[in-house]
């Protein structure tokens, strides 16, 4: 007799680890991203910047339990979307095992995936700070999560056509980082440049704390994506830390070469770039491969931020595309190069004799990037035509905290 999910035996160790991992990933958004981004903006915009991440988490949480999870992870329909048979969580039992993680409860897997959806849209906010209407941002969250994140998550993780193609993404290189980075690029194209495009961090201490919380939370992000408390989680944990450390050191070296001094902002940017790049590869690569991935990714992101952005003239305020988009692309491609079958039998990369894996990775990168860019442009155009995307010039110059929220971050 075939065992059903109701008959599956839940594992208390796996469940405990995944509860911790889910909380760790939540910590990345609230308050990790909020603090990281908030410290990098002008003091007149710190509350608005932080609130963009907080409200993204709240709105996405509602979308996810209403319909988002089911469309992303429901039974596959023609490779493109999931079947919404359990809308509003109807039919999901307290002790029902998750279909994609049969040793943990379904509710826990739903919550874990919720934190990924929330941080993805929160990351986009870093590109549009200091000039986007809050009302437009609220509408953008609903439309983007529904029309971009949910389908892409299904294609890669929910049994959709990219999964069927064999594309690997252990914890979100395509679904989270390429998706958010390219969407950010599309949105800033529509918004245009700020009146003052200088990066003037008003409190780098906030950003250091935020980056530290991101680094800490990323162990839940990557090691948690093993979905069990076993050897694969431990391997993902170690390679995640290795890539982050290599990314930080690499960016500091680039700072020395360009300006002659190390910068704190450069160090934390490099760590985040390393974390982004190892995300798709964390459950597939060795420690030496993680070291290479981290060292290389900071060079790529550094060049994107320092040379590509000014050459192309787009105003990605906090370099979401330069760090998340570019490092996500490199990490996804690197997975196709370095995936080791003795780490995870699901992946064999080019250097271990499987060029087809690299091909699958490149296709996934191209498909997700193209879809995210085009649909984000359409969403942005629609919002610009209806509610308007951008605040007034007066509001932008005087700061969004007082004009949009009637509050101020500091009373000194």
From Swiss-Prot:
Q: How the protein sits in the membrane?
A: Multi-pass membrane protein
Tell me the protein's name: Putative ammonium transporter MTH_663
Q: Does the keyword Transport apply?
A: yes
Homology family:
Belongs to the ammonia transporter channel (TC 1.A.11.2) family.
Q: Which InterPro entries match?
A: Ammonium/urea_transptr, Ammonium_transpt, Ammonium_transpt_CS, NH4_transpt_AmtB-like_dom
Kindly list the GO CC terms recorded for this protein: plasma membrane
UniProt source species: Methanothermobacter thermautotrophicus (strain ATCC 29096 / DSM 1053 / JCM 10044 / NBRC 100330 / Delta H) (Methanobacterium thermoautotrophicum)
User: Which keywords label this protein?
Assistant: Ammonia transport, Cell membrane, Membrane, Transmembrane, Transmembrane helix, Transport
Protein's cellular compartments: Cell membrane
Q: Lineage, please?
A: Archaea, Methanobacteriati, Methanobacteriota, Methanomada group, Methanobacteria
């Amino acid at each position: 007799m075939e065992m059903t999910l109701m008959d599956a035996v839940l594992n208390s160790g796996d469940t405990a680890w995944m509860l911790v991992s889910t909380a760790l990933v939540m910590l990345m958004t609230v308050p990790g991203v909020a603090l990281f981004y908030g410290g990098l903006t002008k003091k007149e915009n710190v509350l608005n910047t932080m609130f963009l991440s907080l409200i993204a988490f709240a709105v996405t949480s509602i979308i996810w339990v209403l319909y988002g999870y089911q469309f992303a992870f429901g039974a596959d329909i023609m490779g493109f979307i999931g079947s919404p048979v359990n809308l509003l969580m109807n039919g999901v039992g307290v002790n029902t095992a998750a279909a994609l993680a049969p040793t943990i409860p379904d509710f826990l897997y739903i919550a874990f995936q919720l934190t990924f959806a929330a941080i993805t849209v929160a990351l986009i906010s870093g590109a549009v700070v200091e000039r986007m209407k809050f009302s437009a941002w609220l509408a953008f969250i609903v439309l983007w999560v529904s029309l971009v994140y949910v389908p892409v998550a299904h294609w890669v993780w929910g049994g959709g056509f990219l999964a069927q193609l064999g594309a690997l993404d252990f914890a979100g290189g395509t679904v989270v980082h390429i998706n958010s980075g390219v969407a950010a690029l599309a949105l800033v194209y529509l918004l245009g440049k700020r009146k003052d495009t200088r990066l003037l961090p008003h409190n780098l201490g906030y950003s250091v704390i935020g980056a530290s919380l991101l680094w800490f939370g990323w162990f839940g992000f990557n090691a948690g994506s093993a979905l069990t408390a076993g050897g694969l989680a431990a391997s993902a944990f170690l390679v995640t830390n290795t890539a982050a450390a290599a990314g930080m050191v690499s960016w500091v070296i680039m700072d020395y070469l360009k300006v002659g001094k190390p910068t704190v902002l450069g160090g934390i940017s490099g760590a985040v770039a390393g974390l982004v790049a190892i995300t798709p590869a964390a459950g597939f690569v060795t420690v030496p491969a993680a070291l290479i991935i981290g060292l290389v990714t900071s060079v790529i992101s550094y060049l994107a931020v320092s040379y590509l952005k000014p050459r192309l003239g787009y105003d990605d305020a906090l370099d979401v595309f330069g760090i998340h988009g570019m490092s996500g692309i490199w990490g996804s491609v690197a997975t196709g190069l370095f995936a080791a079958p003795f780490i995870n039998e699901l992946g064999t990369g080019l250097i271990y004799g499987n060029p087809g894996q690299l091909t699958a990775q490149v296709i996934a990168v191209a498909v997700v990037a193209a879809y995210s860019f085009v649909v984000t442009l359409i969403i942005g155009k629609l919002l610009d035509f209806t509610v308007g995307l951008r605040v007034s010039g007066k509001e932008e110059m005087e700061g969004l905290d007082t004009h949009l929220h009637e509050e101020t971050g500091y009373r000194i």
